[in-house]
């Protein structure tokens, strides 16, 4: 274990309350219960927030006409926590759990789980030592994005029945906020959406006002995300968001995504493109230049993403028709959401059919947001704590 709260609770800071975004929840417990669980997640973040009055929300109700005919707008309630408060929230939450007697095993690597013996085997990373054993009565298996390959290995080992997931890959787009202000006034975390035959494409995880691009490292490869801080001292009048494709029909989505991401690496980091070098990579919230290699050609991105890159180019062209930002933009590549096939679980407690004391949650159950991940955990806990 090397962290807590996941990417959504450590660097993103936006809680999306929706039964159609962020992963499967309502199919297990129904719409009303799903909304209640997600509201409890919001309440937990509020409870441990050092300045809860700083939390703001966006709740759009109608689509604006000016995005037609190019886009649909996916509307949902979004709570903006402020990424500069997340570390304090995590520390407050962690202290609360310690006071309640929860044990944490830091800097330990789980090397195997034997569901049939209720046995978790773990040790110090890279030491080659004999693994220690921890036995459990109930197990909540809730790996983060960096544990998707481990989740896949467990699924393969036990031949778990699964539901295949689509590839989720694209780029992190960035431009001055002024071009998007009329849409931001409607929806802070706007999600523009297009549907094609086997590909859907959407804007994702929008950040405004004090918006910064974040570098992520997963499996030794660099990808990009974004976050927004709260407070005028952080404002940079920039907007960034992912442009993510959901590609169906690829035989091994995880392997395909890994290969595409590796093709987008250069000198130990990712790529940045701006037409005609109009823009350069932006500064992080710490004042450093975002780690990336600037390229004057779209060819390496096109080579990595193949025929699917045309959907991203079309999406940007359509945005330009609506928001008229000309060449005043850039993007970082790649942005990726690794998803392994979703295990089929019992609806009443998210447990495996053959191992009723093993419950899957979060990324292990193909969640794509901290709100749904947290709701998975609460839903399971309600069943376990009588």
Where are the regions a protein language model picked out?
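Electropositive, gly/pro-rich neighborhoods at or near active sites that engage anionic ligands
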Residues: 22, 48, 52-56, 244
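Residues forming the flavin
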Residues: 1-14, 18, 56-386
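Redox-cofactor-proximal catalytic regions of oxidoreductases
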Residues: 1-47
